[in-house]
């Protein structure tokens, strides 16, 4: 008996050691979830390995649970070792037997407590996450998404404080304040009804005129039935036969202080020229206007306005058309006259050049003076040679000769015979041959060029040839025969 008891104690110690070893943490791949409390696990398959028992959990005091009682058979022998095809669980051996498939009740309780604690932990974590998400969602606010209708309503609400206006338009609150009228008409001045108040819009009073009365113009003073002035006409709109008049006030309270209400009859004083100004329709027909809007919805400039009367407009267009045609005709005439002037100028130059070429070939003197015009042929020797000197410029001009230009220093002094001079008693050698022709830019001057109206023209534009002048009269016997050109050398 002692041997049996010793063997039982040894087996108990072995089982306790294996239980403590199994309490060690297992790898994650070998852990299996415990069944819920109150549910028995299914029995293992005959050919498969049995499921490993769950690790025992310690109680709150940190002590391990008591080991289960060993299962002995009826003969008092220990249980046989496990089958070869079954693997022992990691961490130690486990007891097999008839009741080995059922886990110990203590271990089931510990497993259920572990699962409960895990579920509670999961629930706590989920509740904490939900609470944190709810708190974070309450802290962060997103702008609401508006539909098209909501956006239009919001824009309309914002634009109420900013009315639409053109570039240079003045709003009512931007206009100067209305002056207060304290005019009371006496009883002897007649009043005539103008119309009734049809509507009151903020600080404006609209008066609809009655028929069969002449329309009145702006700044006409309007009176109430008690003969007190209500205000001046601010604007007129509508047809000429049935216009609407607008009275402007500083505010709606100003209108109430005047005692003006809808359907009140308003009057005007037709006999008071200082308070009443009429609109003359005939004058409007003469004025030009336009209903079309211009830049920034303003009135168009005067040059693009139209007449109110069709006949006046037709006359104005015809007058404008005739002016344009007159300007075109004058321009064409000026162009034609310019072309004619150019043609005459070209013919003039061509004729002058031909005459110059003839003078070079058939005349003896390069200056172009004819011998037979101013000199008489002597029956003796030829006239002596006389050279032109710059000191006798004035004497040449007095006789009608054009002096040589002094701005050309290259020009030589050409010989020419003195007019009206008889040289019978002065025998001189014959004259030298004629010099070469002058440059093309030099013109030919006629004897009467000093008195010709085209004297101021440049030398490149010579005048046309003129008829020869009459011969000069013969000198008197008592006249001094001294030369006008100085002594001979």
Curated annotation (Swiss-Prot):
Keyword flag rRNA processing: yes
Bias type Low complexity, positions: 124-138
Region: Disordered, residue numbers:
1-150, 289-339, 421-489
List compositional bias (Polar residues) regions by residue number: 478-489
Report the principal subcellular site. cytoplasm
Q: Where is the composition biased (Pro residues)?
A: 35-70, 77-91, 427-441, 460-477
Give residues for the crosslink Glycyl lysine isopeptide (Lys-Gly) (interchain with G-Cter in SUMO2): 331
UniProt-listed Gene3D superfamilies: Probable tRNA pseudouridine synthase domain
**Sorted alphabetically, which InterPro entries does this protein's record hold?**
Gar1/Naf1_Cbf5-bd_sf, H/ACA_rnp_Gar1/Naf1, Naf1, Transl_B-barrel_sf
Phosphoserine sites (modified residues): 308
Gene Ontology MF terms in the entry: RNA binding
- N-acetylmethionine modification sites? 1
Which compartments does it reside in? Cytoplasm; Nucleus
Q: How does it assemble?
A: During assembly of the complex, component of the small nucleolar ribonucleoprotein particles containing H/ACA-type snoRNAs (H/ACA snoRNPs) which contains NOLA2/NHP2, NOLA3/NOP10, NAF1 and DKC1/NOLA4. Interacts directly with DKC1/NOLA4.
Its job: RNA-binding protein required for the maturation of box H/ACA snoRNPs complex and ribosome biogenesis. During assembly of the H/ACA snoRNPs complex, it associates with the complex and disappears during maturation of the complex and is replaced by NOLA1/GAR1 to yield mature H/ACA snoRNPs complex. Probably competes with NOLA1/GAR1 for binding with DKC1/NOLA4.
Task: Tell me which family the UniProt entry assigns to this protein.
Answer: Belongs to the NAF1 family.
Q: Which PANTHER family match?
A: H/ACA RIBONUCLEOPROTEIN COMPLEX NON-CORE SUBUNIT NAF1, H_ACA RIBONUCLEOPROTEIN COMPLEX NON-CORE SUBUNIT NAF1
Query: What protein name is recorded for this chain?
Result: H/ACA ribonucleoprotein complex non-core subunit NAF1
Gene source species: Mus musculus
Gene behind this protein: Naf1
